[in-house]
């Protein structure tokens, strides 16, 4: 047993300095605001945009550890209580801290607001989730940013409208967001199918290292799970992979994570440029 077999007590951390909520920032490792700004500037110098994400209203255990009253008593403390006005006060303050001013901490054109894996057990909470999603899309837009979300609106199917125009959706699992329906609604998609592009180091599920040979020879961003769009479909903006460190204390170091990232990054970068065409066989690409 770990954490007394209580999910609400598991390890969680927010890794960016916060002056609005000083006790929120992790003490065992974090970026100061200046460090994060400098990192973004470094990326800009090589034409890379860092898109910061504050994931809510699920995956938010770090927030409810800091402010327990905004955690959901029904769905677990890693879910925010969407019926509590303090939840919105907290999230408004957090986003505002990094978005306001002439030189905001979040420098780029886009900000990801999360919206991943919230419970859909109750129709009433589904409508509140959709309301939350729409609210924070518009909130980050009010600071001049383009909003990005995780695909969840098939899982959270409901009546409350959620803004889709100029919104980018990370399409990770078709059961959560059916790709063609999302495109029909107006979203632009980033293809990140979990069964092909998820790395969870030394966990025993998903990939420890991506199957780069399979990706190189068979996959393009037009393949969103089992749905295959036309190559260069304007609704598909590109693709990506993810590294999720679900297990801490399992012997995986930062260097180990980098070792998993490099071949994945190299392979997907080539696929973003070339699509279905392959200038060299995989074996030759792998040697290079």
Positions of PLM-derived features:
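Short, conserved beta-strand edge motifs with alternating hydrophobic and charged residues
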Residues: 17-18, 150, 190-193
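Structural preference for beta-strand elements that scaffold enzyme active sites
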Residues: 47-51, 108-112, 146-148, 166-170, ...
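Alpha-helical scaffolding within the catalytic cores
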Residues: 93-100, 155, 176-177, 224
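Acidic carboxylate-rich catalytic motifs and surrounding loops in phosphoryl-/glycosyl-chemistry enzymes
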Residues: 149-156, 282-283
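Flexible, acidic glycine-rich loops studded with aromatic residues
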Residues: 159-167, 174-288
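Active-site beta-loop-alpha junctions enriched in small/polar residues
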Residues: 3-5, 55-59, 116-118, 152-155, ...
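Substrate-binding cleft of carbohydrate-active enzyme catalytic domains
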Residues: 1-143, 147
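Short glycine/threonine-rich loop-to-helix capping motif typified by GTGT followed
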Residues: 119-132, 159-174
